[in-house]
Amino acid sequence: MEKESQENSTRPDASSTVFSSSKSTCASPSYLKEAGDLISRLPDDILQLILSYLPTRLAIKTSVLSRRWRHVWSDTWSLSFHRDRPDAPCINRILDRYRAPKMMSFRICSCCRAACISRPDTHADIDSWINFAMSRNVENLSLYLDEDKYDIPEFLYINSSLKQLYLDFGCKKDFISLNPKCSVSWTSLKNLSLYHCNISDESIAIILSGCPILESLLLFFCKKLKVLDLSKSPRLITLEITRRCRMEPTQLVAPHIRCLRLINSEKPCALVDVSSLSQAELDITAYAIVDNKLEADFHQTMVVKMLEKCQNVEKLTLGANFLKMLSLAELRGVSFPKLKAKALILETMISRYVIHGIVKVLQNSPDLKKLTIHPMGSAGSYPIPEEHIDIYLDSHGLNWDPSWSSEFKNTSRRNVESKQVASFLQLVLKTISTLELIVARLEGYIKGRRFVELRQMVPMLPRNNDVSIVLSSRRKRFRVT
């Protein structure tokens, strides 16, 4: 650092000065060099850990800093070649220079289109990269395979080091089939995620039989699977399924599952056995509405049946579309099951289209202690259009409750008022008396002046019980009562 007299004599040139956090001092180039040297003095393990969080192409650029940095990247614990990745020949050269005997994570996105990179990947390229990662006993493997007619190599199905496997075959018209022609042995695998693939009942059974300690399974837009039977996987406790229109599975047998996230589609998925379930997140999608006709009768039946299978769940999350269909079911007088939920999360904007369903769920949850309201869109950004719900109501001679219809009419984030949120909270307090805590996560939904107004309104709400209300807006939380 310069002496104090020199610091105060002239103002340093902006091109060579960076202001530090102190108001009275500045960082000169010599100071920055010293700071840089301090970083370079860190142990290799620390530097490699830092670089492992960067895309590999950026980590390699640190090699020009000094001799000390020249080979640090080549011993990092992970390699990542994603969207802005280099060509296959360049990747091969990088792998040739990689020296770490053990790899924690390998992530690669293949590209079969010449527009993406100068030379599209060949199947041989992809096979060699997978083989390289396996030769370093990789634990977390993520493959984004935007390829046509690519078959997973048989050697991938036999591996004892993999703990997490992520396979995404790209959103193409014709999905790639995951069809192991050999036995599967993933003896250390705990988390398996499959995106955009064809997988039959037989194939998933073969895969599961080779994963004795699998704990988590994710299926996103998977076809061909009819019955997902997890009864022989006692350690598999977390399941996430997102189904598109007319996609599978259609039956779920999962007696050991404790946590379920199911985003259903127009085609039903029967929950045959989910008897151990303690947490569930449920919603439906609206990918295909033909001739402006919403199959609301079918959806109402489906959501009520799903709710019945989750009667014993202690933590329940319901999405916007799910609540819209529950509201229609309530208007038609459909019987709702009694719920044992102690914590309920509502992921929906506040509107007349969900109020009836919310009130009925609250009335049927006598053990509820905590309610979280998180205004957000529907699952997968495919909300059921409200004009289709209006058409359905008109055709069946149904009407919303007049008081709720006017008070909760607006659904747009731009139109929401603090009074509307306060009225909703008041409705909740009037509906259920067992609540101990209400958390309203309003980030991005109501802010600025309206949020301040809401904070002033909430303490004035009438209530018959001692319930705390927490309002959250972006980074700040306010316990107002």
UniProtKB/Swiss-Prot annotation:
Residues 1-28 are annotated as: Disordered. Residues 14-28 have a biased composition (Low complexity). Residues 36-84 form the F-box domain. Keywords: Leucine-rich repeat, Repeat. Gene3D superfamilies: 1.20.1280.50, Ribonuclease Inhibitor. It comes from Arabidopsis thaliana (Mouse-ear cress). GO terms for cellular component: cytoplasm. InterPro entries: F-box-like_dom_sf, F-box_AtFBL13-like, F-box_dom, F-box_plant, LRR_At1g61320_AtMIF1, LRR_dom_sf. This is F-box/LRR-repeat protein At3g03360. It comes from the Eukaryota. LRR repeats lie at residues 118-145, 196-221, 295-320, 350-375, 413-439. Signal peptide: none annotated.
